[in-house]
Every structure is written in C-alpha cells, then in structure tokens.
Amino acid sequence: MAALKEARSYGLSCGRVSDGSRVSVFHVKLTDSALKAFESYRAHQDSVSLRPSIRFEGSQGHISIPQPDCPEEVRAFSFYLSNIGRDSPQGSFDCIQQYVSSYGDVHLDCLGSIQDKVTVCATDDSYQKARQSMAQAEEETRSRSAIVIKAGGRYMGKKVQFRKPAPGAADAVPSRKRATPINLASAIRKSSGSGASSVVQRPFRDRVLHLLALRPYRKAELLLRLQKDGLTQADKDTLDSLLQQVASVNPKDGTCTLQDCMYKSLQKDWPGYSEGDRQLLKRMLMRKLCQPQNATTDSSPPREHGRSASPSQKRPTDFIDPLASKKPRISHFTQRAQPTLNGKLGAPNGHETLLPAPGPTPSDTLSSSHLPPRLEPPRTHDPLADVSNDLGHSTQDYKHQEATPAPAPHLGLPLLTDFPQAEQPTSSSHTHSRPKKKSKKHKDKERPPEERPPAPQPDAPTAPALPPDAPGLNGACDNEPTSSSETPDYLLKYPAISSSEQRQSYKNDFNAEYSEYRSLHARIEQITRRFTQLDAQLRQLSQGSDEYETTRGQILQEYRKIKKTNTNYSCEKRRCEYLHRKLAHIKRLIAEYDQRQLQAWP
C-alpha cells in the first residue's frame, strides 16, 4: 500500500459498499504469536490448501490459521468481542480502504463505522514470552546489584602489613583545621538509602498496599518496583496470594488495582512516599472515603493514578477540590440570568458569588459581544466533575468576575417571544437605563402581555431601528423578575450536607436532571449561534451601507424563521435557567461538604 503524501488531495468514496451488503468492519487487536501466524500464512499461502476462518459464538469466538510447515494443521486463537462505544467513550472510528484505480489514481473508500472490537486472547506462547521478559528483567536487576563477600572465604588468614609514615614537620599553625571534602553522590545515596531501608523494615503487606494505592501495577512491574527497596524470596512467593486478598486483577491487561476497602489501612506519612505522592494519596483518600459503603464504585483506576501531583499548585495545599477536573476559566459574560436570592449564592468562605448564566440565549448573545463559555458534556467517571466551566470553581474566580465587569456596546436585535408581534414596539440598540426606567419596565412585565403599554424607545443614534413587526429586546421569558420573598424550592429541598449518604443522594438527583439540562442548553445554543454570527458581522459594517442593511434584513429573516419552528422556546429557556441554578446549588453543597471533610482529615 502506497503511503499518502502531504499537501495532496485524495478522493473519498462512501458508495462502494452499499448498506445492504454483508460487510462488517471490526477493530482487531492481535497478539505477537497471532500476528506471526498471519504473516507466515501470507508468505506461503500459495502452497497451503486450507484457508483461514473466523467463527463467532456470541461475544466470543476463535480464528483458525493454517500452518505452512504443517499443511494439514491449523492454529486456533480464541478472542472476545467488545463494543467500542461502551468501552471507550471517545467514540467509534471509520474504516478507510486505500486502493488504486485502473487509471493509476489513488482513492480512499469508507467501508463503514467500526463499532466492535475483536481482541485475541493470549496463548501459551505469549505467556512464555512474558516469562522470558520477566526473567531478563530480573537478570538485569541482579547484574546491577552489589556483590557481598561473606566472611570466612579464601582470603581469611592473610595478614597485610602497613608501614607507618615517616615523621614529618609539624604544622606551623596547629590551630588550623583542614576541611574534609564532601562526596555529594555518597551523601545523596545515604539520604535515599535511609528511606529505602525504613521501607524494607515495614511489613510486606503494607509495602504492596502503599504501592498499589498510587497507581495500578502489573505483577512484573510490581516485582521490579519492590526489588528496588529490597525483596526476599519468601515475600516473592507470597505475592500471588497477597494480591488476591487486597487487589482486583483486570483480566484484559493483567493490571492489579487496590480494592476500595483497603484504603482505610493506608498511612499518609509512609516513608517511601515523596511529597507529590502524599498529595496524591490525600486526594485519593478524600475521594474514596467520601463515598458511602454501599455505593457502586467503578473498578477502573482513578485518573489521578497516572500522574503525580505537582509540588507547585495554584490553589493552597490545604484545599484540593475533588470535583475540579479543569482549570478555572474567567467568563467575560456581563449579563446574568434570573437571579436567585437577589442574584447571589453563598460561597463556602462566606462571600457571595454571582451565579453565571446557564448558557447562550437569544437575548444574551444578541445584546453582548461575548459568548459565555460553552458547557461541556460530563465525563464518564463523575458527571459532577464537569458540569460547566462556570460552575464549581473557587470563590476567587467569582469575585474576579464581580470586581471586573466587562460592559460592551449592545445592539438591538430580535428575540423570540410568545405574544403577538403587533403589540410590540420598535426597538433599537439599548443602553444601560436609569434605575427609574428599569423598575418601570419590571412593573410592566408583571402585567399580562395584552395589558402592557408600548415601551418608550431609548435614544441611541449608533444602532438602527427595527421594523414594527419585530418584538422588543426583552421577551416574555428573558429576564423575569424573581421576588426576593419567594424562596426557590431547591433551597428548601437541599439544605447543607451532613453525611456521606446525603451526599450520594444529592449526587443522584443531580445526575437525574443533568441530561435534561444538557439537552435544553444544546437546543438554545443552536438557536442563538446563527444570531451571534450575524451580530458580529453587523458590528463590523458601517451604519447605512448596503451591506449593513442586507445583514440586518437577514437577521430579521432568520428570526421569523426560527420563531415559526421553535414555539416552545420561552418555556425551554425558563426551564434551562431553573435547572442551571438548581444544579449549581447542589454542586456547591457537595463541594462544601467535601472541603469540610478534607479539612477534618488528620
């Protein structure tokens, strides 16, 4: 197969294999012995009468490959079938076939989407190769170790005579002391050797527990790691039985993961740990011990196992947020959604933090030049960890948002509403109104739509006026005032957390409504994305030009089209904002509880 060249275009076809054809595409993972058997057959397939075959039996099966040296015999390799979408949440792949046409051109053909994976199981040859690799690693370790000469050898009994040096002149300055040179390498070895010797004196079970607590190990890797500190033959013989008691073995890759019940036996001041290892263990203990005993835990190792904690941290070392999985990002979004309790939520340290809006809405995106950060989908291990880049971060981020607002010039653009267009006044780009006008506008909103008087048109010479059929900037569901006397139901239903069972219950409620929140937010964002693009184009054009009027008319046309196809937008937006505030409240309570547990941990 010819390699694809850079800076060259190739044709990609998807029609060679029709939907009705019986072609299935799999991702196949072979062992070394299976790959050698395939290559041997490919090299001598003309001299072999038999043909390879594959047989599926449910989620398992076997592959038969003829042997060129024994034409009448075949080698059988068993395999198991797994779903890529379930095992790896990153998604599936497409199978692309490269072929050369009759004219000599290179083409690419998409055979289909790879949804299943075939993993060939290891055979005796694979285990034999693993044993040889392990023996070779032990031999290399033994060759680097020191040779101890026992007393009573062949050199015993020989005497060595030392001659005394001739008396020389005495030092003219008796009080002078000569500095003894220091060997830096030997000093480092002594300091590191003291920690290793203290680890060797500890029980073998504790040594294995504290190694598996940091990350999963294969048995061969664990043996090599234990040999660095010192390993006796008796401890080596008991390793298999010990792993069965304290670890869970993954049958796919053979990695050993420490069982959750064993984390209570760990010591944070283990002598073999570095400062980064202690920070990592502290986070792991917080995550494991905060979960209730009857909660279902994942058998896969936590993601912190793969890396050690950095000594320099942006947050103080006494607070490590177990839910934070991303760096905090400051939002430049200035207008907020409907406030809860006067727009504030209590922070863990006593300050009040401003709750960001749930996502881009028509009024937000059309009246601001900045989009709020887009909410990202949750990760598979914990949906609470990645609700939004605007939720669950430290109080300093929220204080920074309150202290440094970024007002931008706004532009009057249409917004989806539920009441007739004929009753809405003409609107232009709005400026920040005075308090009297703002309170009057809120009073008008509390009336039914048919009783509202036309709103006065603000003076803004920098933006065009929309035609009479366009609604105002503030729709029925845009910024409904929330009375400070009415406490939201979630504040009464979800008080502060006092136990791990209550934490798990809050987390379950969060997960139950988070999918609905994501769906609503995605629909709202899809509606507003087009208006945001047109708004950016309109800001770059000069008022009164042909391009300006064309873009402005396109905005109105897009608005009318979206209003016809999305009649329930106002209700969905209201529901999305409510879920945003509710989920943010639950997440904040969980973060406060975890912080209290972490500070109380000795």
UniProtKB/Swiss-Prot annotation:
The modification N-acetylalanine is found at residue 2. Pfam families: ELL, Occludin_ELL. The modification Phosphoserine is found at residues 300, 542. InterPro entries: E3_ELL-like (IPR042065), ELL/occludin (IPR031176), ELL_N (IPR019464), Occludin_ELL (IPR010844), WH_DNA-bd_sf (IPR036390). Residues 403-416 have a biased composition (Low complexity). GO terms for molecular function: phosphatase binding. Residues 431-444 have a biased composition (Basic residues). Residues 332-341 have a biased composition (Polar residues). The keyword Nucleus applies. GO terms for biological process: in utero embryonic development; positive regulation of transcription by RNA polymerase III; positive regulation of transcription elongation by RNA polymerase II; snRNA transcription by RNA polymerase II; snRNA transcription by RNA polymerase III; transcription elongation by RNA polymerase II. The keyword Phosphoprotein applies. One of its GO terms (cellular component) is euchromatin. SUPFAM superfamilies: occludin/ELL-like, Winged helix' DNA-binding domain. The modification Phosphothreonine is found at residue 180. Its main location: nucleus. Keywords: Acetylation, Nucleus, Phosphoprotein, Transcription, Transcription regulation. Residues 488-598 form the OCEL domain. Residues 292-489 are annotated as: Disordered. It is found in: Nucleus; Nucleus speckle; Nucleus, Cajal body. Residues 454-470 have a biased composition (Pro residues). Component of the super elongation complex (SEC), at least composed of EAF1, EAF2, CDK9, MLLT3/AF9, AFF (AFF1 or AFF4), the P-TEFb complex and ELL (ELL, ELL2 or ELL3). Component of the little elongation complex (LEC), at least composed of ELL (ELL, ELL2 or ELL3), ZC3H8, ICE1 and ICE2. Interacts with ICE1 (via N-terminus domain). Interacts with ICE2. Interacts with AFF4; the interaction is direct. Interacts with EAF1 and EAF2. Interacts with USPL1. Belongs to the ELL/occludin family. Elongation factor component of the super elongation complex (SEC), a complex required to increase the catalytic rate of RNA polymerase II transcription by suppressing transient pausing by the polymerase at multiple sites along the DNA. Specifically required for stimulating the elongation step of RNA polymerase II- and III-dependent snRNA gene transcription. ELL also plays an early role before its assembly into in the SEC complex by stabilizing RNA polymerase II recruitment/initiation and entry into the pause site. Required to stabilize the pre-initiation complex and early elongation. This is RNA polymerase II elongation factor ELL. It comes from Mus musculus (Mouse). The lineage of its organism: Eukaryota, Metazoa, Chordata, Craniata, Vertebrata.
